[in-house]
Amino acid sequence: MARVDWTKLNLKERVVSINRVSKVVKGGKNFRFSVTVVVGDPDKGYVGVGRGKAAEIPDAIRKAIEDAKKHLIKVPVVGTTIPHEVIGEFGAGKVLLKPAREGTGVIAGGPVRAVLESAGIRDVLSKSLGSSNATNMVYATIEGLKRLKTAEEVARLRGIPVHQLFE
């Protein structure tokens, strides 16, 4: 997949989780921070997730934002929702995403909501299954969004006209 030129996008950043981790050494405990960040351009339908690790929180956030900008994906949006139902899996985390009619809003838990809103999806139903770890939920949501295909893409892959899909 070609890398997206993020300099042309109006990216918004959201910190999803900050985790303090420790390494026990002879002299005591060394603390570091692991941060998960979601960046996205809701108007153009791009979203990315990144992780950063550092001794200080601001450094970890900066690294996570840089990582997220390197991993942007384009999300197919039909009107204000997604084209079809999909399940994204990452580790023990599963996220079920369902299209919803206009006016429903984003019905999703914290980490999943951050990804969907950053991608510009305004109407969607979701259910988190399995792991409730914020990082796993975010990556499972991204995996689900990567699997989405529009009717035009499916028709092109099958080599048939779009109207034939719905007959």
Curated annotation (Swiss-Prot):
One of its GO terms (cellular component) is small ribosomal subunit. Keywords: Ribonucleoprotein, Ribosomal protein, RNA-binding, rRNA-binding. SUPFAM superfamilies: dsRNA-binding domain-like, Ribosomal protein S5 domain 2-like. Residues 11-75 form the S5 DRBM domain. PROSITE patterns: RIBOSOMAL_S5, S5_DSRBD. GO terms for biological process: translation. InterPro entries: Ribosomal_Su5_D2-typ_SF, Ribosomal_uS5, Ribosomal_uS5_bac-type, Ribosomal_uS5_C, Ribosomal_uS5_N, Ribosomal_uS5_N_CS, Ribsml_uS5_D2-typ_fold_subgr. The keyword Iron-sulfur does not apply. It holds the Pfam family Ribosomal_S5_C. GO terms for molecular function: rRNA binding; structural constituent of ribosome. It comes from the Bacteria. The keyword DNA repair does not apply. Belongs to the universal ribosomal protein uS5 family. Part of the 30S ribosomal subunit. Contacts proteins S4 and S8. With S4 and S12 plays an important role in translational accuracy. The N-terminal domain interacts with the head of the 30S subunit; the C-terminal domain interacts with the body and contacts protein S4. The interaction surface between S4 and S5 is involved in control of translational fidelity. PANTHER family: MITOCHONDRIAL RIBOSOMAL PROTEIN S5. This is Small ribosomal subunit protein uS5. It comes from Caldanaerobacter subterraneus subsp. tengcongensis (strain DSM 15242 / JCM 11007 / NBRC 100824 / MB4) (Thermoanaerobacter tengcongensis). The lineage of its organism: Bacteria, Bacillati, Bacillota, Clostridia, Thermoanaerobacterales.
